[in-house]
Amino acid sequence: MENRWQVMIVWQVDRMRINTWKSLVKYHMYVSKKANRWRYRHHYDSNHPKISSEVHIPLGDAELVVTTYWGLHTGEREWHLGQGVSIEWRLKKYRTQVDPGLADQLIHIYYFDCFSESAIRKALLGHRVSPRCEYQAGHTQVGSLQYLALTALIAPKKTKPPVPSVQKLVEDRWNKPQKTRGHRGSHTMSGQ
């Protein structure tokens, strides 16, 4: 029987960012209790030698699993010291990988207080609404005019420490795409 390869998307992340992610997850699991249903698996609980940790986040019947890896091949830069993160959505036997933005939205739907679009209707009907969102990473679109007016009326309160964001975990701070600048007379660089 021949070897069968399975390809996974692993986001290269520096070690300090992974440590920050782990400490934020543990803080919200054990201290603030906002993520008390989450499960943290240490490297010694896994039988895979490259897995550093796993965070299992229940989402109704499904769960989101954020796995951190170590000992991978180094990346293009010296700070990519073989560390990585994969994000997987599981429902019974079905598994698929998701991107960090979608992972943040899924976490946002199930956890943490939110001042969302439904707050507009509740406020108009005279109901009491939660004045702020604790998980700003879950909002990717620009809100409606009424939503923006309500959020401008009530200033967001910064939570310390912040809620763990998967998108912030895999964000690449150092490798921003560089803008191409040519010489003054170069038509090939400016596209003219």
Swiss-Prot record:
Subcellular location: Host cytoplasm; Host cell membrane; Virion
Phosphoserine, modified sites: 144, 165
Highest rank taxon of the organism: Viruses
Keyword ATP-binding in annotation: no
Region (Disordered): 161-192
Stretch list, region SOCS box-like: 151-180
Record keywords, A-Z: AIDS, Host cell membrane, Host cytoplasm, Host membrane, Host-virus interaction, Membrane, Metal-binding, Phosphoprotein, RNA-binding, Ubl conjugation, Ubl conjugation pathway, Virion, Zinc
GO cellular component assignments: host cell cytoplasm; host cell plasma membrane; membrane; virion component
Gene responsible for this protein: vif
DNA-binding is among the record's keywords: no
Sequence segments annotated as region (Interaction with host APOBEC3F): 14-17, 74-79
Residue ranges, annotated region (Interaction with host APOBEC3G): 40-44
Its membrane topology: Peripheral membrane protein
Biased composition (Basic residues): 176-186
Residues bound to Zn(2+): 108, 114, 133, 139
Region (Multimerization): 151-164
Name under which the protein is recorded: Virion infectivity factor
Region (Interaction with host APOBEC3F and APOBEC3G): 54-72
Lineage: Viruses, Riboviria, Pararnavirae, Artverviricota, Revtraviricetes
InterPro entries tied to this protein: Vif (IPR000475)
Note: Vif-defective viruses show catastrophic failure in reverse transcription due to APOBEC-induced mutations that initiate a DNA base repair pathway and compromise the structural integrity of the ssDNA. In the absence of Vif, the virion is morphologically abnormal.
Phosphothreonine found at: 96, 188
Function summary: Counteracts the innate antiviral activity of host APOBEC3F and APOBEC3G by promoting their ubiquitination and degradation. Acts as a substrate recognition component of an E3 ubiquitin-protein ligase complex: mechanistically, Vif hijacks a host cullin-5-RING E3 ubiquitin-protein ligase complex (ECS complex) and the transcription coactivator CBFB/CBF-beta to form an active E3 ubiquitin-protein ligase complex that targets APOBEC3G and APOBEC3F for polyubiquitination, leading to their degradation by the proteasome.
UniProt record, GO biological process: viral life cycle
Residue numbers covered by motif BC-box-like motif: 144-153
Induction per the UniProt record: Expressed late during infection in a Rev-dependent manner.
Annotated stretches, region: Membrane association: 171-172
Major localisation: host cell
